[in-house]
Every structure is written in C-alpha cells, then in structure tokens.
Amino acid sequence: MKSLQQKYPNSKFIVGDGKQSFWSEIYENNKAIIDSNQIDDYKDIIWIKNYPNHRPYRVYDKKTHTIKYTWNNTFKAKKGEIFFTNQELDFSTNVYSEIRKKIPNKKIVHIEPNLKLKKGFMNRDWGFEKWQQVVNELKDDFVFFQSSFGKNKILQNVINLHNVNFRKSCALLSNADLFVGIEGGMHHAAAALNKNAVVIFGGFIHPSITGYDFHKNLYIEDEKSPCGLKDECNHCQKCMELITVYDVKKAIIRLL
C-alpha cells in the first residue's frame, strides 16, 4: 500500500472486485483506504483486487481448486501498515506497563498457538502440546504473552488476556519483543510492525511467497513442498513433526 500511495498520492484505494468492497478491520484508521459506499466522494479511485477467492498469492485452477491451493510462486509478500487509534495504543501501553512493573527484566514474547478452523488450516498446525513445551522450557527466561478470543485454547504459564479482537492483539504485539506463531494473520501483523518473529511454515506454503526475510521462517523443503492440500495431509504432518521444540527454542533465544 505504501508504494501505491507514493505512486498515486492523490488517489484513494478500495479493496474489492471493481463493484463492491471487501472491508477488513485491519483497514480501519487508514485514510488511504475507503469503502465502496464512499466512492462518489473522491475523483481518483484505484481498486485493489485482493479479497476472498481472489488472492494474489494463489493461482485459481478450476481442476484442482477443491482439492488444493495452488500457489503463485511469483508473488512476494510486502510489509503492510497498521494505523492504530489512540485508544488502541493506550490499551496496549497500559497492559505492557503493568507486565513490566511486575516482571521488569525479561523480554516479552507474544505467542499464538491457535489457527483458524477452516479447510486446509489443519495442515499448518504444529501442535498445541509443542507450543506448551516451548513455554514450559523457556518460562524462566522470558515472559510469554497470549491474547485470545472466543474458543481459542489458552496456554499455561503465560500471561493471557482473553476476548481481545484482532486489532487490539496487533496493538499488544506492537509492544512485544518477539512474535512466535504459525504462518497467518499475526505473522503479517508482526512484519507490518517491524517485529522480529519465529514463524512456522512446515511444508504447506513457502516463506518465499508469504514470508518475510527478516523473520526466522521454519520450513521443510522436500519434493512435495509446498503442497497446499486442503484435506488432512500426511506430508504436512510429517513436515511439522520435523520442526522440533528445540528448533523453535533455539530460534527464540537467537532473536532475543
């Protein structure tokens, strides 16, 4: 978005299909992005065609669409931007001030062990018990913070704040020293906030597509990777098994 704004400084942007917008809470407070119902208020409008079932990192093959995600290997994720409200920033600052008062001399790791309950996402699952093991083995050295919502599983030995929406989770992440989790929305947020991160990719999608070079991306390269299968996949499970608790711990320690 930043590069588009620099190229078209007098334009407003709508994320959508040319007819209707697909609004996301992540666009809130971004003055460059408008909703389609505001289209008559501006002269220069540019549509950004990035919405459900029309993602730039995917190739939509009708023959295989129901079976797997086909990745666009020419795509490379670029860091986005998040524009917080003063209330969101104050919320995050207050939470972290309290944590640092009680535990003043430890780095804080924002951890996200949960994943969406959607088709294909089980192939991104590293395993909740392994996340718990990472926390248990490093809790004396670092503070682990987990924001959660709804039916999310909550780790033990973490500081948890429950029923926190995505934007507030991102605001909280902005004050952390490191993000640790799977490939997904929060790792993109970490990049937008210039936060170091340990991101587990497994063998489902390649970090050259949706990863960031300044993150530590844990990916298993083999002849079937990145497979993109939507149903439960033995290959993806094997790749996740090859990424050990030790690998994640080592990456965290190196980045902190």
Model-predicted regions and their roles:
Residues 1-256:
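Catalytic machinery of carbohydrate-active enzymes
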